[in-house]
UniProtKB/Swiss-Prot annotation:
HAMAP family: LepA. It comes from Mycoplasma capricolum subsp. capricolum (strain California kid / ATCC 27343 / NCTC 10154). Residues 4-186 form the tr-type G domain. CDD domains: EF4_II, EF4_III, LepA, lepA_C. The keyword Disulfide bond does not apply. Its EC number is 3.6.5.n1. Required for accurate and efficient protein synthesis under certain stress conditions. May act as a fidelity factor of the translation reaction, by catalyzing a one-codon backward translocation of tRNAs on improperly translocated ribosomes. Back-translocation proceeds from a post-translocation (POST) complex to a pre-translocation (PRE) complex, thus giving elongation factor G a second chance to translocate the tRNAs correctly. Binds to ribosomes in a GTP-dependent manner. This is Elongation factor 4. GTP binds at residues 16-21, 133-136.
Amino acid sequence: MDKSKIRNFSIIAHIDHGKSTLADRILELTNTVEKREMQDQLLDSMDIERERGITIKLNSVQLKYHSKDDKDYIFNLIDTPGHVDFTYEVSRSLAACEGAILVVDASQGVEAQTLANVYLAIDSNLEIIPVINKIDLPSADVDKVKQEIEEIIGLDCSNAPLISAKTGLNVQDVLQAIVDKIPPPSDAIDNAPLKALIFDSYYDKYLGVVMSIRLKQGMLKVGDKIKLMSTNAEYEVTSLGIKTPKIVKKDFLEAGEVGWVAASIKTIKDVNVGDTITSVLNPAKEPLDGYKKLKPMVYCGIYPIDTNKYQDFKEALEKIELSDSSLVYEPETSQALGFGFRCGFLGLLHMEVIQERLEREYNLELIATAPSVVYKVHLTNKQVIELDNPALLPEAQKISKIEEPFVEIKIATPSEYIGDLMNLCQNKLGIYKNMEVIDNNRRILIYQMPLAEIIFDFFNKLKSISKGYASFEYELIGYKESKLVRMDIKLNGEMVDAFSMIVNQKFAYQRGSALTLKLKELIPRQNFEVPVQATIGNKVISRETIKAYRKDVTWKLHAADKSRRKKLLEKQKEGKKKMKEIGTVEVPQEAFVAILKIDD
């Protein structure tokens, strides 16, 4: 194969700027997909992706393009997720490319996520082609957006294609720019030791785990014995090929190509995105750069509302895990919610998507506890434990300090909302770092803050303050010591484990008061008085009381019969006291949902 005719590229964009629509037009113009098979967001395979207008799962497709100079080229388009939760996947798919198309909405301009992905592309030394989309919108301001891209990102936009991916206007110019500007694979040597980058994987019921790969050097044939360099596990290649987007089998793949390989691998957990495949007979000395093992950032307990559905829930998680190796879970029991699972996710969007898939694809009704991050707890005996479940935090006297994950957050916003957004960040314990100017009307705010403050309700508040115009992205910068305490909720003197949370000391009273008040509203009245207490250790920081129903036991007495009246009331009082000692309080479903919204 003539390597000078190969172009490997990704499309990067902020959510809703038209990435998947441009991919659709490229597939149409290169006759990769017949008109009758075409549907919107073709590469987005999940219903949730189409509905939310986001890309979650990576996809790659090989296209053939006949250029203006009458030559045939092979394009490998590697689709990328655009959301902050999937940053590592984006970085690995960019590592499989030589170039990237940067799509910017002509009416919206440069957004926070655009910048995040562009910086990843720059780190990977990719040739970046800016493309300005949606030029047919009445609100489009092409000159302003060109200026933004040049000033903020530093890309020359004098020859940037101006397109409408929806109508197909000028998309042909993008295809020609790919040929002219993106270099062919430079380091692709067929006779060197095999090195192939795994940039995605999924489970197929016939083939087992299928790995999406970019061959950096060497060749790969059916029957070859291969080794995954991060685990040293060895397998034999059973089939390989390319996607067009249909699965097409081939006998071999050469250096520079993008394709797929299957090797009878049973579970997706055995394959790590970013790992290097090499040959058992002639192994490479060093793996490719950039591999890291993905660790969940956000945890929560998920329980089926109908306890009889526990087995169905377990099977549903097992099936989802086949296509999503970043999901982790382990069984968990709660006195309040029964049997469920503690699940770990890459971030909030990942958590929402998994929950939605469980409910929609497997017909389950679920309830989730408040999300939590992974804390590093330093004990007085010099031991350090990592903990994601607030209910398991040791007693205060055994702890010397607690560290929590901090992130650097970048918020792109119209200038008019800056004051309110700075207040929001300060209320979330944000530390101001910098403010960058995009243009006369837009700024980028840079803060550092605890991840725990972002996962609660930061996104909703940011959107409501800015009327939907602000966008943000964040990256983990490490762990820092914080003054954290465990807050428990007691109903009728009994602790409800599902309500436990780790909070900053500064917010403990405020959150405790808000939660006890909310629970007082939501928990139905009983035949006995129920105290609702927020506690830290043995100290009660907030209390509300749910008043008891009172039955009128004296209704049939004569008004003058005072001693009889007193006797009946005493008897009622004794009965209530006994009931209070043995009575349990039913906590309605809404109360568990309320805990997620106590900051509102």
